[in-house]
């Protein structure tokens, strides 16, 4: 078994990772959260493969989380069912976008989500999944072991999003003349500010009129020190997130506000934080401590449409 306490959690220029190290571990943690969400009486997301990924990775803390009689979400210090809310937001985005004219979808930093397999895509929809080579290799191996069949024309692109991913995307059959649904979920905080700017410049350059974007972002510069304090405060002994400081993976830099950046380039933008999503989805959230509410409201789930 691989143990997260034995990993190096520092970042460096051009760093890479597998599914149980660095940024890759966050994808595994999110898969664990989706597996926990699956057990809700009325789950916000149904992901039949999430638990398979966690068990195949062999990370003992996350496996213990799933085997607990009362599993806790892997992200203490956030709104309860946060990953369920986040997953539903992006699920609904893709369903609505592809049913309103987007013929292809690009999932930037796809991680271990299996939207290409579990969403009801319109016939012929191309779904491009971009992520680190070792992450996609692990994902494909587990999916093959469980005879998973995509509900879309799935195309995996093993590439670092700090490199020339547009060339790889075009080589895989992406058509920049066709409206596209783009997503950046759990991504931009792990990018340097300059890399974030370049990412969205490339998205805009590749987007035909009618394209849509969904982004997990923040309102203003996130207080990463505060996030670290919250993690320590609410992760009890034995919780996976008590073993590592996930904020060491973030880039604490001044960066463009994604919603404002897209709006300045002619996109029609909307945004919500997780508590607003919960209200929209009819999810009752218990009263939260003030410091948790403050952090949750820093989040911004952005959707943007490029007018035709």
Swiss-Prot record:
Q: Name one GO molecular function term.
A: methyltransferase activity
Which residues take part in binding S-adenosyl-L-methionine?
A: 131, 160-161
List GO BP terms, alphabetically: methylation
State the top-level EC class.
transferase
Q: Does the keyword Cell wall biogenesis/degradation apply?
A: no
Tell me its family.
Answer: Belongs to the UPF0677 family.
By what name is this protein known?
Answer: Putative S-adenosyl-L-methionine-dependent methyltransferase MAB_4584c
Q: Which organism is it from?
A: Mycobacteroides abscessus (strain ATCC 19977 / DSM 44196 / CCUG 20993 / CIP 104536 / JCM 13569 / NCTC 13031 / TMC 1543 / L948) (Mycobacterium abscessus)
Phylogenetic lineage: Bacteria, Bacillati, Actinomycetota, Actinomycetes, Mycobacteriales
